[in-house]
Amino acid sequence: MIHLKRPNSPSKLINEEAKLTQEFLQNGNSVWGKPYIKLALLEMSNNKCVYCECRLDEESKYMEVEHFLPKDTYPNLVVNWRNLLPSCKRCNGKKGTHDSKKEPIINPTVDTPSNHIKMFNYCLKGKDLKGKTTVDVLHLNQLDRLVYPRMLIGTKTIETVEKLLEMAENFNLNINATGRIKSRIIHGTTQLLIEAQPHSEYSATVASVLFNNEDFVKLKEIMIKCTIWNTEHQKLLSNAERNILVEPLYNCLNNKN
């Protein structure tokens, strides 16, 4: 889970909010399912569930419009832009009719998730009552659906760092120091950091792993020494820092290019 910036309400929703709300109050129609609402929400979340960060189908097939404050309890907010979030079916179902006003949970467009939850061994733990309630209500430590995917991408991240570090160490020692290997190190590191960006699936997991990985720190130091760590790498790393759900063991932002 990462913080998201909510854009302004779609102009069409501004024009139709009163009419759609009245329609829901009168006959209970699913007025929140308008394509322009779904598309705006998907754009806001980079096509991901705001809670678990799983990828949502681009055609909205598997995306559900989640009401942060439940529509049955707060019907006048049924299409209020600030009450709508894009969610996967699993998270929307787990949250159900939970009243987030009476028992607050994290709203990723309002709160900074890392202030309330942390990651340990690919499981999420609450740092305060809001964080604990969020983890419990959304069942964010479901082993098969969430913890296992985090572990897989975390393991893949660690393996990628190890491969890049080995290439960088050899390059630094003038072993196989070809232009091709240089390009593989540069582009491989760029792609690795892209996986920690807000638009990538499970970006919080990737970012958290990188900022707690000694090999990644070594990789960065060697790349700086060999003058192949560039401004794009630094920018991507700075962006990734905003997504971490751990207290970093290493200050990866030191030794800036």
UniProtKB/Swiss-Prot annotation:
HNH domain mapped to chain residues: 49-96
**Pfam families linked to this entry:** HNH
Record's superkingdom? Bacteria
Q: Which CDD domains match?
A: HNHc
Q: Does the keyword Nucleus apply?
A: no
A GO biological process held by the record: defense response to virus
User: Which GO MF terms does the UniProt record name?
Assistant: endonuclease activity; nucleic acid binding; zinc ion binding
Q: Which UniProt keywords apply?
A: Antiviral defense, Hydrolase, Nuclease
InterPro entries xref list: HNH, HNH_nuc
Q: What does this protein do?
A: Component of antiviral defense system Septu type I, composed of PtuA and PtuB. Expression of Septu type I in B.subtilis (strain BEST7003) confers resistance to phages SBSphiC and SBSphiJ. May be a nuclease.
Protein name per its UniProtKB record: Septu protein PtuB
Organism, per UniProt? Bacillus thuringiensis
Record gene name: ptuB
